[in-house]
Amino acid sequence: MDSLSQYKVLSAPGTVHYLPNFITEAEETSLLAQVARTPSPRWTQLANRRLQNWGGLPHPKGMIAEKMPDWLQTYVNMVNNLGVFGAKEGVDGIKPTLANHVLLNEYHPGQGIMPHLDGPMFHPTISTISLGSHTVINFYKEEGENSSLKFEDRLVTSLLVEPRSLLVLQDEMYHQLLHGIEEIHEDKIDDKICNLDNSTVIGSIIPRKTRISLTIRHVPKTSKMKLKLGR
């Protein structure tokens, strides 16, 4: 994690590391081509986006581990090498905790995801590589006693996530703040975005394109045996 210190977003309310140009344009092009070649049965279609699970399908009873394809494992290794998932002690001594799951989401302009917490099935670190387009991720307080407040009234901060970047969220950014993406076609840059650089102009409008996100995570509870998940 020491190598990440220069990428920490100091104005964020929790632990955020943002690495622009984590991958090259050539790597992005290769990944997008690989995603485009994915057979249609691999996709799960939802109302507002479609997705793929790689490494297994997370479940409260345990994820049945599957081999990660080589075209994804390369980038899983790149994230693992940063040490973002920490380490744990076992019978063979202290070993790094490694990512074993990738959730691939496809968002067209106008699509997004409702504010949510990722929950206890995952190690409390989210690492996401973005391909093809930027997005803005918003972070909100949970309802608490003020359940009548709309999401916009509970907005804490936002992050501008650019193509080819890596975003790492930890601690209260994982446990306490809901994160979501608005279902809009363009993003207006405002002072709620906490990771703006000097080249970004407040008030500018950025049209969205189709975005692929690779959310790389560690699922602690896994099984090599098929589970009887029930109906």
Task: Set out the residue ranges of the language-model regions.
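Non-heme Fe(II) oxygenase metal-center motifs and adjacent flexible, charged/small-residue loops
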Residues: 1-231
